[in-house]
Amino acid sequence: ILGAILPLVSGLLSSKL
């Protein structure tokens, strides 16, 4: 599960940046 959440968080951070 964490493995699927990490990429999601990275995507959100990239979108904000």
Swiss-Prot record:
One of its GO terms (biological process) is defense response to bacterium. It is found in: Secreted; Target cell membrane. Its main location: secreted. GO terms for cellular component: extracellular region; membrane; other organism cell membrane. Expressed by the skin glands. The modification Leucine amide is found at residue 17. Disulfide bonds: none annotated. Keywords: Amidation, Amphibian defense peptide, Antibiotic, Antimicrobial, Immunity, Innate immunity, Membrane, Secreted, Target cell membrane, Target membrane. Shows more potent growth inhibitory activity against the Gram-positive bacteria S.aureus (MIC=50 uM) than against the Gram-negative bacteria E.coli (MIC=150 uM). Has a weak hemolytic activity against human erythrocytes (LC(50)=135 uM). Belongs to the frog skin active peptide (FSAP) family. Alyteserin-2 subfamily. This is Alyteserin-2c.
